[in-house]
């Protein structure tokens, strides 16, 4: 059962709405299983803001393998090099980077190690900073 205390990170809804209004395709690429992913997305109210929902049990290998990101990029019809992957965990950074995505890191529980700093395109404190990548 999902915890009652599940909270959406700051600016997620606003950022997804911003991207949707700009016609930017979006996907979630998560290490979470499908039923839990769908439950979480519905619970926090962002399911309708995402074009695709990709989870680890839809691919051969989970994060840090690139599979989940490669599948997400394919699902939205984009080459990974044309995609920005927003990640908050080192395994996710590795996964997105190995897929060829431009990785933007938003720190959460685990800081980005020095060994991964060269694979990220940018680091932002929260998702409100993501809009600048689309305004440049």
Predicted regions and their residues:
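Short, acidic loop-to-helix structural element flanking the phosphoryl-transfer center
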Residues: 1-28, 34-38
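Asp-based, Mg2+/Mn2+-dependent phosphohydrolase catalytic module
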Residues: 17-20, 33-136
